[in-house]
Amino acid sequence: GYIQIIHGMEEHKERYEAFAEQLWQAGFTVVTSDMRGHGEHAPKLGFFKEKDGDRYLLSDQVQITAYIRERFQTEKVMIFAHSMGTIIARNLLCTQSHSYAKVVLSGFPNYPGTQIIRIGFFLTNLLTRARGPMYHSKLVQQLSVGNFNKQVKHAKTEADWICSDEQVVQAYLKDPYCGHGFSVSAFHDLYMLTT
């Protein structure tokens, strides 16, 4: 089978190398990519597009699926998506469900609620007009992901929520392509995908 991996927020495809290797050993062909604003080739980490970045994130994955189908002459593409990747996968399924044989959603984020999303839209729109779409707001970052660590008892770092394995957390913290934050326009795009 053929598996398309869609990674999570503020990380990159290389974090999935060991997992992809296990899938390959099990007989799967795996295609990974960095989402816009992620990974070593991103022009600006945490930034997708000045406008409609959400649409581009979806379009990119549709193009990757088309590439897999054409390159490997298959109709049976499976998705493995993690965290923010599951939000993208869920959106793809709303319009492209016929394109995927199976979908695995790992670490699907909790919906923050309509009120939080409305506040997020208000803040990101205001800050985009005042500071520009590439501006990074500590307030928006805190409102969007700041509570993730509250579920971890005796947290030692701000990223303990990502994994119970301390070595994985330390590797994440040391990785220059992880935990870089999102621009206000990227958070706006994320809210668009969540609604």
Spans of model-derived segments:
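Alpha/beta-hydrolase active-site loop
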Residues: 50-70
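Glycine-rich nucleophile elbow surrounding the catalytic serine of serine-hydrolase chemistry
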Residues: 81-91
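Conserved alpha/beta-hydrolase
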Residues: 15-45
